[in-house]
């Protein structure tokens, strides 16, 4: 006997006029997440998700494309003003910030939240190429 079909509710879009853009730029990838002011994710994108593979993920252009994608999704949810938190030493930091402001979003503030150790873990040894 056939089971009755489950009724699936369509995900309703949140209207979030003010939010926060978190840019996490590592040496290998750049991840951009747009959240509301309480920290709930509204949209996100990364260099890898945007179609870049391998060493091309760490380029500024890949970060720019990812930031444009995430900003477009956030604007669909009504986001107009953002504060930017940047974390990490990656090459995509500046490109991602520029792409967010170029997408038509008003940037309220930019804050660097890169964790700096007070002589914590031993860093990886230097590469000899």
UniProtKB/Swiss-Prot annotation:
Domain of life of the organism encoding this protein: Bacteria
UniProt xrefs under NCBIfam families: PRK05309.1, uS11_bact
Keywords: Ribonucleoprotein, Ribosomal protein, RNA-binding, rRNA-binding
Family, similarity comment: Belongs to the universal ribosomal protein uS11 family.
Organism: Desulfovibrio desulfuricans (strain ATCC 27774 / DSM 6949 / MB)
Presence of keyword rRNA-binding: yes
Single Gene Ontology BP annotation: translation
GO cellular component: ribonucleoprotein complex; ribosome
One function term, GO molecular function aspect: structural constituent of ribosome
Subunit annotation: Part of the 30S ribosomal subunit. Interacts with proteins S7 and S18. Binds to IF-3.
Protein name in UniProt: Small ribosomal subunit protein uS11
PANTHER family assigned: 40S RIBOSOMAL PROTEIN S14/30S RIBOSOMAL PROTEIN S11
Described purpose of this protein according to its UniProt entry: Located on the platform of the 30S subunit, it bridges several disparate RNA helices of the 16S rRNA. Forms part of the Shine-Dalgarno cleft in the 70S ribosome.
């Amino acid at each position: 006997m056939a089971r009755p079909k489950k009724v699936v509710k369509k995900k309703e879009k949140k209207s979030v006029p003010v939010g926060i853009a978190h840019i996490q730029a590592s040496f290998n990838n750049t991840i951009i997440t747009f959240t509301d002011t309480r920290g709930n994710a509204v949209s996100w994108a990364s260099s890898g998700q945007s179609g870049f593979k391998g060493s091309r993920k760490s380029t500024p252009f890949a970060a720019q494309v990812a930031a444009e994608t995430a900003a477009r999704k956030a604007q669909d949810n009504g986001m107009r003003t953002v504060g930017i938190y940047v974390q990490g030493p990656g090459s995509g930091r500046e490109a991602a910030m520029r792409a967010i402001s170029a997408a038509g979003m008003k940037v309220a503030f930019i804050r660097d939240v890169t964790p700096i150790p007070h002589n914590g873990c031993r860093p990886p040894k230097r590469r000899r190429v």
